[in-house]
Amino acid sequence: MEHAITPLDPLLPSGSLKYCLVILNQPLDKCFRHLWHKALLRACADGGANHLYDVTEGERESFLPEFISGDFDSIRPEVREHYAIKGCEIISTPDQDHTDFTKCLEVLQKKIEEKDLQVDMIVTLGGLAGRFDQIMASVSTLFQAPQITSLPVIIIQEESLIYLLQPGKHKLHVDTGMEGDWCGLIPVGQPCNQVTTTGLKWNLTHQMLGFGTLVSTSNTYDGSGVVTVETDHPLLWTMAIKN
């Protein structure tokens, strides 16, 4: 079975995918308002609420998340109080073996099921800048996500998007006009022994990807508008978002 996705669809004014939005503890991009208004359900992971609070000064009534979850070591007291007073659900998830992002996905999936929402994707803002250990924690959550939700989970920050391709065949539509000029395939978890692609300037044919051998960075598109990837192990897709 081939898995088809248009990764940048949520950023399009005419985008058709239904999605939920997760805000992580990093500065919010200019696409934040667009993503917020189109989302079916909105959540903040701990300190993500600080950034939401700060960037919406003067219009906070229009930007109330359905819930804020986390161990609450990052959210400022006045921010937590503000959203609690406004009726946002405050959910403590103290487990230190998982990140606030991972735990937020768990809560979000339960909400989707409780509300019987028809959702195509989970869009995450933040998690790809600043501290390298936290960037890798975001990637680790993508590896855990299939045990939490059947929905594709993408992470967006500034000019980058990442999405973890599971073993199998994938079709990525890259003809929205929002794509930047670079893309890549990163074998983060373990080497991929058999990777075959079409639609890239530098395609792979039954090739191995692995750190210390070959990593497909700074690739680009062949102009066809569609990239196909077949992989035998999880493989991280990354792509540029046009400013």
From Swiss-Prot:
Function: Catalyzes the phosphorylation of thiamine to thiamine pyrophosphate (TPP) utilizing UTP and therefore links the biosynthesis of TPP to pyrimidines metabolism. By producing thiamine pyrophosphate, a cofactor of the mitochondrial pyruvate dehydrogenase indirectly regulates pyruvate oxidation and lipogenesis. Although it can also catalyze thiamine phosphorylation using ATP and CTP in vitro, it does so with significantly lower efficiency and without physiological relevance evidence.
Class of this enzyme: transferase
Gene3D superfamilies hit by this protein: Thiamin pyrophosphokinase, catalytic domain, Thiamin pyrophosphokinase, thiamin-binding domain
CDD domains found in the cross-reference section: TPK
Keywords: ATP-binding, Kinase, Nucleotide-binding, Transferase
GO-annotated biological processes: thiamine diphosphate biosynthetic process; thiamine metabolic process
Catalytic activity of the protein: thiamine + UTP = thiamine diphosphate + UMP + H(+)
Keyword Nucleotide-binding attributed: yes
Leader sequence residues: none
Subunit structure: Homodimer.
EC identifiers of the protein: 2.7.6.-
Name used for this protein in its record: Thiamine pyrophosphokinase 1
Molecular function as annotated in GO: ATP binding; kinase activity; thiamine binding; thiamine diphosphokinase activity; UTP thiamine diphosphokinase activity
Family (UniProt): Belongs to the thiamine pyrophosphokinase family.
Gene name of this polypeptide: TPK1
Pathway noted in the entry: Cofactor biosynthesis; thiamine diphosphate biosynthesis; thiamine diphosphate from thiamine: step 1/1
